[in-house]
Amino acid sequence: MTIYLTELDSTLYFPSPEEALTEPNGLLAIGGDLSPARLLTAYYNGIFPWFSPYQPILWWSPDPRGVLPVAQLHISRSLRKTLNKTSLRFTVNHAFMDVVTACAAPRRYSEDTWITSEFMQSYAVLHEMGQAHSVEVWDNDQLVGGLYGLSVGKLFCGESMFHRQTDASKLALVALCRHLSRYDAPLIDCQMQNSYLETMGVQEWPRAEFLRQLAQLREQSFPAECWQPQVLTL
């Protein structure tokens, strides 16, 4: 079967997410680059890059979309017990590139990573611009878990997470949700559903509904103190 995709050029143009393929679900465009400007344009329009090593850059907007309503975060009984007795510390924007680097490391189930050096360089710039943020989990001075993503107005677009201790990435997500709730941020974009995220309360929304929410939230903004480096109390 022949697949027709828009090939991106040097402009920042993206086709409408509604033009994405149904198979593979959400594939919208190919090519372009991972410059900070293009990444921002993509995320502000409900599009994200995802590709394997040695593939061209692929851009996606799946239907349905994986989203986590912050108020509906699910904390299992076992995770709640861990949370109640933990001595771990949680911070925002204390070690952004360390988190990105940890997320880019090979996983047990795969040696591949889509977090390329170009992607990491662009995210470093986005962090300096105040657009990209991280949550860190610390055991004393050791970074044992975390996540990072991009703020699009009052929508947080999660990119990746990691853990070096059991449940550390889940605890990072709990910390993020509680932090966002203090600033009335209602939604985290998780891109695509999976069994791990489903246990945390991630839902599948029709793309059209996600795009409606995105259109509203991208016009709002966090106060500056939201993303200042800080220690989080859970």
Curated annotation (Swiss-Prot):
Q: Which organism is it from?
A: Tolumonas auensis (strain DSM 9187 / NBRC 110442 / TA 4)
Q: Which GO terms describe its molecular function?
A: leucyl-tRNA--protein transferase activity
**Pfam families, alphabetized:** Leu_Phe_trans
* Entry keywords, A to Z: Acyltransferase, Cytoplasm, Transferase
User: Which PANTHER family is this protein grouped with?
Assistant: LEUCYL/PHENYLALANYL-TRNA--PROTEIN TRANSFERASE, LEUCYL_PHENYLALANYL-TRNA--PROTEIN TRANSFERASE
Q: Name one GO cellular component term.
A: cytoplasm
Gene3D superfamilies found in the cross-reference section: Leucyl/phenylalanyl-tRNA-protein transferase, C-terminal domain, Leucyl/phenylalanyl-tRNA-protein transferase, N-terminal domain
Protein purpose = Functions in the N-end rule pathway of protein degradation where it conjugates Leu, Phe and, less efficiently, Met from aminoacyl-tRNAs to the N-termini of proteins containing an N-terminal arginine or lysine.
List where the protein spans the membrane: none
Biological process GO annotation list?
Answer: protein catabolic process
- Indicate what this protein is called per its UniProt record: Leucyl/phenylalanyl-tRNA--protein transferase
Q: Which reaction does it catalyse?
A: N-terminal L-lysyl-[protein] + L-leucyl-tRNA(Leu) = N-terminal L-leucyl-L-lysyl-[protein] + tRNA(Leu) + H(+); N-terminal L-arginyl-[protein] + L-leucyl-tRNA(Leu) = N-terminal L-leucyl-L-arginyl-[protein] + tRNA(Leu) + H(+); L-phenylalanyl-tRNA(Phe) + an N-terminal L-alpha-aminoacyl-[protein] = an N-terminal L-phenylalanyl-L-alpha-aminoacyl-[protein] + tRNA(Phe)
- Look up the EC number in the record and give it: 2.3.2.6
In the UniProt record, what gene is named as encoding this protein? Answer: aat
Q: Where located? A: Cytoplasm
